[in-house]
Amino acid sequence: MNQPQLPSPPQLRFSCSVIFSRNLVLTLTQSHPLCGTSLEPTPMCKRVVQQCYLEPHHQTLRSPGKLSLDSFTSLTSLHASSACTSPRWSGTCY
């Protein structure tokens, strides 16, 4: 709960799109420790991904470069809103 440089006001929760393809999401979901090894992500992982990926406007996320496990680790270690607005991701607000 210590994020002095990454405030996450509720207003910003879904004002971005961190979008990667479903295949990439599934691949990373299977690979990431938080998600276990099945196609069904754990609640924690699922929540982080869904808040950016499946919320109101059904935004799609695209990584500016190669989406790596490191990127996904950073994504899951931040609040969803912070991850959406993180410099690591490039997204368009809708």
Swiss-Prot record:
This is Uncharacterized 10 kDa protein. It comes from Narcissus mosaic virus.
